[in-house]
């Protein structure tokens, strides 16, 4: 079984969440590929059994959309590209709004035909406005991400 994790990260916190989810998948024997959204090929997403999409939470989007590279990746996918595939979303924020970004990602993945495992993790890390990197995710959030990976592997 193979999983693809697509993410965008300005300060490294969303990448860290992707790595934590990957560890949970790996524990269950899933082969994981992690790619930056801006460099990933949306046409190849259907080559994987599981697709995970992660984005930081930016206040300027009013918590309605993922980061632009993530949105562009999902928008470039063909309708029903994920039919028969398992998918999930995750987001990282310094303050609030991550749950809404996760829900927006999940809605888009479902519109592409995926069976969405919900809710994906909303991780607390970083600093408001990304003026500095801020603190890393706490142990509870790291475990939440790993558990989400294990859950996806079990449901696949």
Predicted features by range, described:
Residues 1-4:
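Extreme N-terminal starter segment of soluble prokaryotic enzymes
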Residues 13-16, 20-35, 47-156:
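FMN-binding flavodoxin-like domain, especially the glycine-rich phosphate-binding loop
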Residues 36-40:
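Short acidic loop-to-helix transition motifs that present clustered carboxylates
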Residues 8-12:
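Short polar catalytic/cofactor-binding loops
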